[in-house]
A protein has these predicted regions:
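Active-site-adjacent helical/loop segments in soluble small-molecule enzymes
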Residues: 26-82
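Residues at the C-termini of beta-strands that transition into short coil/loop
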Residues: 44, 88, 189
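Short low-complexity, flexible loop/linker segments enriched in glycine and/or proline
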Residues: 4, 57-58, 156-159
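Glycine- and other small-residue-rich loops at beta-strand/loop junctions that grip anionic moieties
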Residues: 18, 22, 40-41, 60-63, ...
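A short, charged, Gly/Pro-tolerant segment at domain boundaries
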Residues: 68-69, 87-92, 193-196
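Glycine-rich phosphate/pyrophosphate-binding loop at beta-loop-alpha junctions
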Residues: 1-35, 75-120, 130
């Protein structure tokens, strides 16, 4: 609407910030925005997820996605040595949405990841991988042991491991340890993560 210079209707709006997901600005409000707003910052869903995780982990606050727009916008601005007020509003969020956002945030920060390795199909291999991961302080969340990846079952078994890490550096350390042990690890991309939008 600001670009067009008049109130315009979008064909669709797709965002997790549902409280501000409007296709058309208000007729009465729009002239005030034209006259008084200096700039508009566009925030994508992945930035809102990071802002949500920051608020939960660092401030122990739950703020709905639309209420986090101001926090996410701060990362686009030079706020050093300035007094800034970021208004946080709303707690309209159900537990399932909250859980999903936290999970996606952990994935974006490399705090949760899945790696696939091929193992010889013989006793002790799973224990060997588990011991290596424990040594690297990788916390196993989930294991998927697939013996049907190959026609020759004795040749290889696929093991998919979902792990908790401290961040990107730790994740890379775990992957390097698996590589060093001769496992040719492959990172598995999570389907449906917000970063794919």
């Amino acid at each position: 609407s600001l670009r067009q210079g008049q109130v315009t209707t979008l064909s669709e709006v797709n965002t997790i910030a549902d409280g501000t997901a409007v296709k058309r600005p208000g007729e009465k409000l729009f002239p005030y925005i034209q006259e008084n707003v200096d700039d508009i910052i566009t925030i994508d869903d992945s930035e809102l997820i990071v802002a949500f995780l920051d608020m939960v982990e660092n401030h122990k606050m739950i703020v709905e996605n639309s209420g986090l727009l101001t926090v996410a916008a701060l990362k686009h601005m030079d706020v050093q040595k300035k007094k800034i007020v970021s208004i946080l509003s709303g707690g309209n969020m159900d537990v399932i949405t909250m859980s999903s956002i936290v999970q996606h945030g952990l994935i974006q920060r490399d705090r949760v990841f899945t790696v696939s390795v091929l193992l010889p199909d013989k006793p002790g291999e799973l224990a060997r991988v588990s011991a290596l991961l424990a040594k690297e302080q990788g916390n196993i969340i989930k294991l998927e042991h697939n013996q049907f990846i190959s026609i020759n079952r004795n040749a290889a078994v696929e093991l998919r491991i979902t792990l908790e890490a401290f961040g990107t550096e730790h994740k890379n350390q775990i992957v390097a340890a698996l590589t060093g042990a001769g496992y040719r690890p492959k990172l598995v991309k999570f389907k449906g993560t917000y970063s794919e939008m």
